Amino acid sequence: MAFGTDPTPDGLANPPIDDLMKHADSKYALAIFAAKRARQINSYFTQLNEGLLQNIGPLVEYQNNEKPLSIAFREIDEGLLEETLGEDDANEGN
């Protein structure tokens, strides 16, 4: 193992897309689900700097340089979130 490298890939490669698809009906639903959660996580970090806490922070351990979307995918993979599409989301793809 070379110094300075991480043996497990980050981002969309980890967790694998096949594992993530077990938690959503379609790739579209998974993308919407993860994007909404990533926006919540991003808002949480912004509010944390301002002293406001209106959103729920990450439900998994994370590193400071980790992107909100990667955190959201890991939360989905671990089954910590439940997917529900609203009317707007369900009709958006049509």
Curated annotation (Swiss-Prot):
Domain of life: Bacteria
Any one Gene Ontology cellular component term annotated for this protein: DNA-directed RNA polymerase complex
Enzyme Commission identifier(s): 2.7.7.6
Catalyzed reaction equations: RNA(n) + a ribonucleoside 5'-triphosphate = RNA(n+1) + diphosphate
Residues spanning the signal sequence: none
Entry-linked Pfam families: RNA_pol_Rpb6
GO biological process, one term: DNA-templated transcription
Gene3D superfamilies documented for this protein: 3.90.940.10
Entry keywords, A to Z: DNA-directed RNA polymerase, Nucleotidyltransferase, Transcription, Transferase
Chain's role: Promotes RNA polymerase assembly. Latches the N- and C-terminal regions of the beta' subunit thereby facilitating its interaction with the beta and alpha subunits.
Listed PANTHER family: DNA-DIRECTED RNA POLYMERASE SUBUNIT OMEGA
Assembly and oligomerization: The RNAP catalytic core consists of 2 alpha, 1 beta, 1 beta' and 1 omega subunit. When a sigma factor is associated with the core the holoenzyme is formed, which can initiate transcription.
UniProt-recorded name of the protein: DNA-directed RNA polymerase subunit omega
Native source organism of the sequence: Bifidobacterium longum (strain NCC 2705)
Lineage of origin: Bacteria, Bacillati, Actinomycetota, Actinomycetes, Bifidobacteriales
